[in-house]
Amino acid sequence: MNPAHLLILAAVCVSPLGASSNRPMPLNLYQFKNMIQCTVPNRSWWDFADYGCYCGRGGSGTPVDDLDRCCQVHDNCYGEAEKISRCWPYFKTYSYECSQGTLTCKGGNDACAAAVCDCDRLAAICFAGAPYNDNNYNIDLKARCQ
């Protein structure tokens, strides 16, 4: 093997990109995280990633409380956005602004971006207004979400 090719192969194998076990989150979820941090600055966005039956991946059963209902509505909102041609909510980026806890979806977003931005904006506002119950974090989904 050519020494130059060997050097390139070694560089790729030990690079941060090749060695990372953490996959980057889809860009839209990064924006949603930032929206949550805008409206609920005193709580980590991770607190919402595994809450109740609907906050996080998937969702089933009856929401356990108002905060979980916010996530159910958000899931349904993404479902509606997916009906727009070539709209993939988890990957669609959009333009928005956060100013002193107020979120605004900016003009210039296409139909998909506008819909996804509004889904995320409304969910982040809902999170800010719903009580957080530590007992509903990381619950047994099989037992409580049927």
UniProtKB/Swiss-Prot annotation:
GO molecular function: calcium ion binding; calcium-dependent phospholipase A2 activity; phospholipid binding; toxin activity
Binding note for cofactor: Binds 1 Ca(2+) ion.
Tissue specificity annotation: Expressed by the venom gland.
Top-level taxonomic group: Eukaryota
Binding annotation for Ca(2+): Y54, G56, G58, D75
Keywords: Calcium, Disulfide bond, Hydrolase, Lipid degradation, Lipid metabolism, Metal-binding, Secreted, Signal, Toxin
Disulfide pairings: C38-C98, C53-C145, C55-C71, C70-C126, C77-C119, C87-C112, C105-C117
Catalytic activity: a 1,2-diacyl-sn-glycero-3-phosphocholine + H2O = a 1-acyl-sn-glycero-3-phosphocholine + a fatty acid + H(+)
GO aspect biological process, one term: phospholipid metabolic process
Entry's EC annotation: 3.1.1.4
CC cofactor: Ca(2+)
Main location: secreted
GO cellular component assignments: extracellular region
Residue span(s) of the pro-peptide: 22-27
SMART domains: PA2c
Class in the EC hierarchy, top level: hydrolase
Signal sequence, start to end: 1-21
CDD domains in the cross-refs: PLA2c
Active site: H74, D120
Protein's cellular compartments: Secreted
Protein family per UniProt: Belongs to the phospholipase A2 family. Group I subfamily. D49 sub-subfamily.
Functional description taken from the UniProt entry: PLA2 catalyzes the calcium-dependent hydrolysis of the 2-acyl groups in 3-sn-phosphoglycerides.
The name this protein goes by in its record: Acidic phospholipase A2 D
Species of origin: Naja sputatrix (Malayan spitting cobra)
